[in-house]
Amino acid sequence: MLEQGHRIGFAENACLFTNAPDTWRQFIHQRQRWSRGLIEALKLHWRLLFKRRMSTLFIWWNLLFPYLDLVYTLAYIPGIILALFGIFWIVGPMTLLVLPLGLLINYLMYSVQVKMFTEQGLKVRRNPLGFMGYALFYNLVLQPACVVGYVQEILNRTKQWGTK
């Protein structure tokens, strides 16, 4: 659509429901598929990076995700594991100061979602333990799965749906 000169917009109160994966395996395959889709879109529509439009910034922003996911997977996760054994070569005690900020950002996003759901007449259940688990551990699963998806697409591996 953008290549044809059409505009896209942002709907801040858009609300959509879908079927979520039932198992970790399905979830990981879904994340890999979405990551492959990002690389595929960048390969097919790279010209959009050079069109002078406001939305071009967001396309450039997508170029950061593979890099950030790769650094998180190859440096931060091993750094956490080493830190658990007292080896602070990559991640040190000061990293713990970032955790409250991460929890705050996740809580702010949760608050915005609760407000939006309330406006739609929907109820969000409270699950503090689930929220903490999500905020602290979700990325430990998400980023490595995404990196595998990026590599699969770059190497032109056979695509599989993988969620059925």
Question: Which residues fall in each region the model found?
Answer:
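Membrane-embedded multi-pass helical conduit in multi-pass membrane proteins
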Residues: 65-155
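Generic hydrophobic, helix-prone segments enriched in Leu/Val/Ile
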Residues: 5-7, 59, 95-96, 124
